[in-house]
Amino acid sequence: RSFPLETRLSNPQIKKLIEGGLSAPQTVTPITDPLSEAELECLLSIPLARSRPSVAVYLSGPWLQPSQNQALMLVDTGAENTVLPQNWLVRDYPRIPAAVLGAGGVSRNRYNWLQGPLTLALKPEGPFITIPKILVDTFDKWQILGRDVLSRLQASISIPEEVRPPMVGVLDAPPSHIGLEHLPVPPEVPQFPLN
């Protein structure tokens, strides 16, 4: 007997124990045709440093300063939107005040929405994407490449693994020491029923 999916998700008796936890059956969509080598070369891979993951970005748009056609931006997968500093833009750009909820709470009067197209690319030859609106930092502190651009570029992020030598600890204490030697010796009194 089969149940509809809504019943299976709400009835705990029908859920199955999968890999140590209760979970509903998962639907997996099979890949019918694998990507060709030409399509794999078109996918964008961003190599990043572990300490400060930043990437060069090529910008164009009607509201940018003429000197700001290339910039180094911080890649932040936790940021929903891309953020540009205000000094990269002309003074009379179309702005809408925005309240941004971050780790430190809601920040008001600091960010504006730039309503206007902005074209971005990670290579001079493309692929180019156009973003309809972008956050502007009025304190000129942040230039962040957010998830909106990364998802439109269909970029994958590769962070190199740090190779560490294996740590080998040398035990120089005699086997009778267990690390409690600094405590006082317990009293020798009969403790019923422990002895």
From Swiss-Prot:
The record ties this protein, via Pfam families, to:
RVP
Residues covered by the Peptidase A2 domain: 71-149
Superkingdom of the source species: Viruses
Name of this chain's protein: Protease
Q: What is its EC number?
A: 3.4.23.-
* Active site location: D76
Q: Name one GO molecular function term.
A: aspartic-type endopeptidase activity
Q: Which top EC class applies here?
A: hydrolase
Q: Which species is the source of this protein?
A: Bovine leukemia virus (isolate Japanese BLV-1)
Biological process terms from the Gene Ontology for this record are:
proteolysis
* InterPro entries the UniProt entry points to: Peptidase_A2_cat, Peptidase_aspartic_dom_sf, Retropepsins
Q: Which sequence ranges are marked TM in the entry?
A: none
Recite the UniProt keywords alphabetically.
Aspartyl protease, Hydrolase, Protease
